[in-house]
């Protein structure tokens, strides 16, 4: 049986990346919540840096 998680960097960035988050109102809310909580890594895009 094929597993559900098939790692793919491009898919991950397009779905959970900074630009994807900024594209929708709810995505911006996610970023705001993570900033408020004090997360150093806001999105998967920040993991590379």
From Swiss-Prot:
Protein origin, superkingdom: Bacteria
Keyword Ribonucleoprotein among record annotations: yes
UniProt cross-references to Pfam families, sorted A to Z: Ribosomal_L34 (PF00468)
Keyword Ribonucleoprotein: yes
GO annotation, biological process: translation
A Gene Ontology term for the protein's cellular component: ribonucleoprotein complex
Gene Ontology terms, MF aspect: structural constituent of ribosome
Keywords of this entry: Ribonucleoprotein, Ribosomal protein
Stored PANTHER family: LARGE RIBOSOMAL SUBUNIT PROTEIN BL34M, MITOCHONDRIAL RIBOSOMAL PROTEIN 34 FAMILY MEMBER
Similarity remark: Belongs to the bacterial ribosomal protein bL34 family.
Full protein name: Large ribosomal subunit protein bL34
Organism per entry: Mycoplasmoides gallisepticum (strain R(low / passage 15 / clone 2)) (Mycoplasma gallisepticum)
């Amino acid at each position: 049986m094929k597993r559900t998680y098939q790692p793919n960097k491009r898919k991950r960035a397009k779905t959970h990346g900074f630009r994807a988050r900024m594209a929708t109102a709810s995505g911006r809310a996610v970023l705001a919540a993570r900033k408020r909580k004090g997360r150093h890594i806001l999105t998967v895009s920040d993991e590379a840096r």
